[in-house]
Amino acid sequence: MADQRMDISSTISDFMSPGPTDLLSGSLSTSGVDCNRKRKGSATDYQESMDTDKDDPHGRLEYAEHQGRIKNAREAHSQIEKRRRDKMNSFIDELASLVPTCNAMSRKLDKLTVLRMAVQHMKTLRGATNPYTEANYKPTSLSDDELKHLILRAADGFLFVVGCDRGKILFVSESVFKILNYSQNDLIGQSLFDYLHPKDIAKVKEQLSSSDTAPRERLIDAKTGLPVKTDITPGPSRLCSGARRSFFCRMKCNRPSVKVEDKDFASTCSKKKADRKSFCTIHSTGYLKSWPPTKMGLDEDSEPDNEGCNLSCLVAIGRLHSHMVPQPVNGEIRVKSMEYVSRHAIDGKFVFVDQRATAILAYLPQELLGTSCYEYFHQDDIGHLAECHRQVLQTREKITTNCYKFKIKDGSFITLRSRWFSFMNPWTKEVEYIVSTNTVVLANVLEGGDPTFPQLTASPHSMDSMLPSGEGGPKRTHPTVPGIPGGTRAGAGKIGRMIAEEIMEIHRIRGSSPSSCGSSPLNITSTPPPDASSPGGKKILNGGTPDIPSAGLLPGQAQETPGYPYSDSSSILGENPHIGIDMIDNDQGSSSPSNDEAAMAVIMSLLEADAGLGGPVDFSDLPWPL
């Protein structure tokens, strides 16, 4: 055991001795030098091989080819991207040319704006709420011809197709004969404008040629966030395919001419009545449609479109428009009354008519414009309506008329009740027009009465007082004019003009008075009663004011003779109360142009004396005794 321990210790000491350590370190250093030598040799060999490749023409050629392939690949990629961008830009430009809202812009839009406008346009055409396709709009069991006949039977009209460029009738259904009494062959190929009323041609041209270029909403630019300007650039307009159209027009009816018994009578009224007989009101409803020229089967000699676009046409159904006359209702159900709004000049002529009047009166708005409302009033109601006309021109309050009869297009009468009020220009203080809200009165309302509408006392003789003695009177008989239905008064259109001139004259005279300078010319009211010392109210003392016959008063309240509106002594005479007019005789015989001029001269002298501009007043020129 002791020997074994000694062997182990000697072995450990031999291992820990410095001799072997130096040997190990020497071997490690020798191996590191060998490695460095090997690394230096490999790097040198690689550099030499590279130099050899560069010096070799074949290697240099391969290097150049490698670099060229990389460059060509980059150029090919850029060319592909450029062609793709160019193609996309061309499609965007073509899409912008097809969208009407993009055509309306004065500058080039960005791509996002064009795409957004295109989406909005597609939603407008197809309908965002109820989209449908052509495959499910009709049952599969029905053919196109059967569907067309069913639609025409349900609509009780005729189908027609009109070219938008010239108004040429390209197609019309056979059912047009039931309405216009023209055959299908008579109308196809003809111009639609030849069968329209002259006053409706402009309206129909507007429906055919108007392109929806103006955007209906404010568009925002995607880049700037600012509203896009909608300046329409001049140029050929593009029709919007799918745009709906609905309008009224009068078309000729192929009816036999009615013989007039009195051939010598050739008045304007009879001609207008004959024109009305030969036209009927058609309500056209449809949409614009575009077809390629190859599908239309057009003549080869027809002129091609300048831009090579599709042929735009109006596809519509025309229905005979019949006015809606309310029928009496026997139940207790109360519905909203039918009414329409009209605007009149101060002489009673129509300047605006609501479209609802067509359903009530059967007149188109353009038929009523420029005509006097008195031409349609029943002759028994003209007196009361003339009084209301005077009142509405003199007051700012609303005037409600009694029930009166208004002549409709077929010659019959319907019962209306109107509310009138005048609009006064705030700058000129003059009445510009009269607004009338006309309500249809049913028969049961007339029998039971309606307490919601105040009643005015009618004046049966005021209608005759409106006309001169040579043209009308209380005992004058109303002649029947050929061509004009009974119930209306011939020459009634001048009544409104006479009332307007009368009110304007009163405004002019009152406007010349200093006391009325600060007040509106519409505030014409009756003056205070005359002094007790003036018998009968005909003689005014100390520069008093004679009573003015108010145009809105009833015959029992109106004065017998007209007078001039003078101001009282405190306003006209001022500090000279000793100057006055003792009496003014207002007899009928003393009213003449010379007397009126003399009276006005005296009034002007009084005004000058009051202002200190003139001398003493000479009353010798007065036609009345002082």
From Swiss-Prot:
Q: Where is this cross-link: Glycyl lysine isopeptide (Lys-Gly) (interchain with G-Cter in SUMO)?
A: K259
Superkingdom of this protein's organism: Eukaryota
UniProt keyword Signal, yes or no: no
Give the motif span (Nuclear export signal 1): 142-152
Domain named PAS: which ranges?
143-215, 326-396
Q: Where is this cross-link: Glycyl lysine isopeptide (Lys-Gly) (interchain with G-Cter in SUMO2)?
A: K259
Region feature Interaction with CIART, mapped onto this chain: 508-588
- Name a GO molecular-function annotation: transcription coregulator activity
For region Disordered, the annotated ranges are: 1-58, 459-492, 511-595
Q: Where is this motif: Nuclear export signal 2?
A: 361-369
Where's the bHLH domain?
72-125
Predominant location category: nucleus
PAC domain sequence ranges: 401-444
GO CC term (a single one)? PML body
Per the record, the covalent cross-link Glycyl lysine isopeptide (Lys-Gly) (interchain with G-Cter in SUMO2 and SUMO3) lies at K252
- Localization of this protein: Nucleus; Cytoplasm; Nucleus, PML body
The N6-acetyllysine modification is found at K538
Q: Where is this site: Interaction with E-box DNA?
A: H77, I80, E81, R85
> PTM details?
Ubiquitinated, leading to its proteasomal degradation. Deubiquitinated by USP9X. O-glycosylated; contains O-GlcNAc. O-glycosylation by OGT prevents protein degradation by inhibiting ubiquitination. It also stabilizes the CLOCK-BMAL1 heterodimer thereby increasing CLOCK-BMAL1-mediated transcription of genes in the negative loop of the circadian clock such as PER1/2/3 and CRY1/2.
Which ranges are annotated Low complexity under compositional bias? 17-32, 511-521
Give the residue interval(s) assigned to the motif Nuclear localization signal: 36-41
Q: What does this protein do?
A: Transcriptional activator which forms a core component of the circadian clock. The circadian clock, an internal time-keeping system, regulates various physiological processes through the generation of approximately 24 hour circadian rhythms in gene expression, which are translated into rhythms in metabolism and behavior. It is derived from the Latin roots 'circa' (about) and 'diem' (day) and acts as an important regulator of a wide array of physiological functions including metabolism, sleep, body temperature, blood pressure, endocrine, immune, cardiovascular, and renal function.
**Name used for this protein in its record:** Basic helix-loop-helix ARNT-like protein 1
Q: Per UniProt, what is the name of the gene that codes for the protein in this document?
A: Bmal1
